[in-house]
């Protein structure tokens, strides 16, 4: 399937969705603390999104039961909010999407709950810094596979490994569109192959970072994804548009 090119009008609509996504995440960032349950946070985000005349994009998507993916400690993505109460030393990944007038925004971040270990601090910094490094490297005409190679290099040079089998993606009138953008260069694939980045494209980059092994395992809830190493993980994501031959973050907080 071809990668869609968005018109200026569509990018304006996607910017609106992205801004609301960022506002919802910023709300959660302010409210995350020891003593708060995951379900309380999920309700805060859902209430805010609905009060803004928008729809939580993840609720019901592929059957997901909640508005926010909340990935605790070793869970890297797709964690389901529960009545678990956050404790000092936890890390929590928050990934949410918003639909506004038929257009989608998508963003994620991983946050410390109070004081965390030095290793977890490095882990959280890795996914955030790798994301921002990749965004700053985007040029019109480069291959998406080059972007995957850049993401992998940024992750591994910080001493970590990317999660395998899951990836960034295009976004627009659907929450997941072409292309798929892995956080690593697949075996046997050349960086200078495949589709190129063009003006008007909109897509999500989302480094998912593991400590020792990138092979995934899906837990019994059939949603939560962990590394087979069982160690803590981290995830950051932004929606990006190519406007004026440069990358513009639509979900900047």
From Swiss-Prot:
Q: What is catalyzed by this enzyme?
A: Release of N-terminal amino acids, preferentially methionine, from peptides and arylamides
Q: Binding residues for a divalent metal cation 1, per the UniProt record?
A: 95, 106, 237
User: Any one cellular component term from GO for this entry?
Assistant: cytosol
Q: Which residues bind substrate?
A: 78, 176
| Cofactor, how bound (note) | Binds 2 divalent metal cations per subunit. Has a high-affinity and a low affinity metal-binding site. The true nature of the physiological cofactor is under debate. The enzyme is active with cobalt, zinc, manganese or divalent iron ions. Most likely, methionine aminopeptidases function as mononuclear Fe(2+)-metalloproteases under physiological conditions, and the catalytically relevant metal-binding site has been assigned to the histidine-containing high-affinity site.
The residues the record assigns to binding a divalent metal cation 2 are: 106, 169, 206, 237
Q: Which GO terms describe its molecular function?
A: initiator methionyl aminopeptidase activity; metal ion binding; metalloaminopeptidase activity
Q: Which Pfam families match?
A: Peptidase_M24 (PF00557)
The EC designation for this entry is 3.4.11.18
Question: What GO biological process terms does the UniProt entry carry, in alphabetical order?
Answer: proteolysis
Cofactor(s), by name: Co(2+); Zn(2+); Mn(2+); Fe(2+)
Q: Which keywords belong to this entry?
A: Aminopeptidase, Hydrolase, Metal-binding, Protease
Q: Outline what the protein does.
A: Removes the N-terminal methionine from nascent proteins. The N-terminal methionine is often cleaved when the second residue in the primary sequence is small and uncharged (Met-Ala-, Cys, Gly, Pro, Ser, Thr, or Val). Requires deformylation of the N(alpha)-formylated initiator methionine before it can be hydrolyzed.
What is said about its interaction partners and assembly?
Answer: Monomer.
Cite the PANTHER family for this sequence: METHIONINE AMINOPEPTIDASE (PTHR43330:SF27)
Q: Which family does it belong to?
A: Belongs to the peptidase M24A family. Methionine aminopeptidase type 1 subfamily.
What is the name of the protein in this document? Answer: Methionine aminopeptidase
**Species annotation:** Helicobacter pylori (strain J99 / ATCC 700824)
Q: Supply the gene name.
A: map
